[in-house]
């Protein structure tokens, strides 16, 4: 199987305040936990771009998601994009809206599994998942939306990682012609 190029994007209401005192924000720790879960599942399968934490800004998020999905530079294009945080009811949390704006097809089952794993508090998560081109995008909840600690985030990644390679490889298969249509010429 070919390498899966992964982009991990943390969304924070404030960026930089934790670093100034030598601490990591929850979003930075969440991105690191997601990366670690991927590497522990199959470190020879994933190439993780440096995790990025940005301020929760819808326009900037849409721009980054489009760039990571559509860039002609194959070294910078992502097959899998995982966002961490920004899915709660707060007016500043617009990750689901930004993600929906760039998606071409929905994959609601992934978000359903994440909400199930998060327990009752996951009712606060509005995360979505889907596809753009040959990239799979998944919104992972932050600490305020059902994953109050890193252990739950790691459990969610443990539940997803066995299926991610097949999901991503499915995006790269040739489309099947509709019934009755002639197959494409070879």
Describe each region flagged by the PLM:
Residues 1-186:
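Non-catalytic beta/alpha edge segments that cap or flank active sites
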């Amino acid at each position: 199987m070919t390498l899966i190029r992964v982009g991990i994007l943390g969304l924070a209401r404030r960026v930089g305040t934790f670093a100034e005192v030598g601490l990591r924000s929850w979003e930075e720790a969440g991105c690191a936990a997601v990366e670690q879960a991927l590497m522990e599942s199959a470190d020879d399968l994933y190439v993780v771009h440096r995790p990025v934490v940005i301020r929760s800004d819808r326009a900037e998020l849409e721009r980054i998601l489009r760039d990571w999905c559509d860039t002609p530079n194959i070294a910078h294009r992502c097959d899998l994009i995982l966002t961490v945080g920004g899915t709660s009811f707060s007016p500043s949390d617009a990750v689901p809206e930004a993600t929906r704006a760039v998606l071409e097809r929905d994959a609601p089952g992934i978000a359903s599994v994440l909400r199930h794993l998060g327990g009752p508090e996951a009712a606060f998560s509005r995360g979505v998942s889907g596809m753009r081109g040959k990239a799979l995008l998944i919104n992972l909840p932050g600490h305020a939306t059902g994953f109050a600690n890193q252990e739950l985030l790691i459990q969610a990644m443990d539940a997803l990682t066995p299926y991610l390679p097949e999901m991503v490889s499915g995006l790269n298969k040739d489309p099947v012609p509709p019934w009755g249509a002639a197959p494409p010429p070879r």
